């Protein structure tokens, strides 16, 4: 066992011990009788018109075998983005916080006089953070190696992840199944949360339109990043009178032509600079157009095309390295980034089974959950690792045991610091509950809402808190119900008041 791992384990144990020591003098909060519900939580459910059987929940002190309160804790529920806790903890546990993705690059040919007589080959391995700045640096590195003109093609190797439409049924029957598209989940293909995983995922396959008012000219200037080759954008829109209300609707955007997005409306004079991220309408062509666009922006020339292909068997000319896994996990959980979670999910299959398929990723995650959580993992249904699914199922007890396990693990600091902090950042920035004292992952879909993480009590004790609502009115649970639950967990110095 490495000395670094031992130091990390000792450090994590010390942190946990300090938390425990700080709470040692405080009496344990009273436990709620089985089958009863704290009055504050019952009242919150009634206020938002949610039935009690829509909720599954656990509140449990860290390190304590007995929960302070449970409600239908073993009932399987759709967790929405709370599923990311399972994926990110498994990734940290199996790969380590310092693990990185590598993107090898080949100058496959001879270089002379600023010309590469051959192909530029880039092989993806699932890096979730090949954002515009890093793509720019990658191509700048190519130029630093003496290449200004590519007398050949830019070849993209995406083979690390298996094609999602090749199913066992299709192989057996030889019938064609529809290729999954970003519109499949909720018919909103331009929403960035619907972007699909890709072994060579560039800039989350998204565009960001920026609108900057210029009152002197009576227009708002429109710009777009990253630069896509061949993309034609309306350079400005007229300024309109009035306050900045639903500015997106007022723009009357038309994204039906991926090559020429249009804005037929106006932009309110009362609006400051605004950004509008969208998923690119033709994801299969996105990488090619981004690479062509940035290469041209750098002054480079390409005589051939950008196409898919295979990387050479020879060692690469250089390798681009991603940020550490801990940084990726932080972005994934703080901002509930679906495509980053799916990249992690398939990376687990690639690293643990040698092939980046969804089937193998489900196998890896299920095996890991069984090994770490035992019987609590029963009833677990895994789909894509992000929670953007109607099929995923797990229990509140599973998430509670997962968080207990994480608390005592060497990667506890990385996982906990990746969670949004109440009233401070991420998806909890607007939360009004226990400012700065709750680290909670949030989750929401149509008919689903949930929170799971850690809450610091008034006594100095820390609690695992899990709550999921599955109901057509689930959206009403945030913030009223979850704020009430978090506040109740934090108020552990008071006697529990039970609902009748």
Task: Outline where the language-model segments fall.
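Short active-site loop at a secondary-structure junction
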Residues: 70-90, 94-95
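Bacterial N-terminal signal peptides
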Residues: 11-21
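Residue-level preference for non-acidic, small/hydrophobic
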Residues: 65, 84-91, 154, 200, ...
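Small-residue-rich helix-loop
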Residues: 68-70, 345-500
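Short beta-strand scaffold segments in enzyme catalytic cores
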Residues: 57-60, 103-105, 452
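Conserved serine DD-peptidase/penicillin-binding transpeptidase domain
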Residues: 26-45, 94-377, 491-494, 498
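Bacterial N-terminal signal peptides that target proteins for export
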Residues: 2-13
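A short, well-structured edge-of-sheet supersecondary motif
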Residues: 46-71, 307
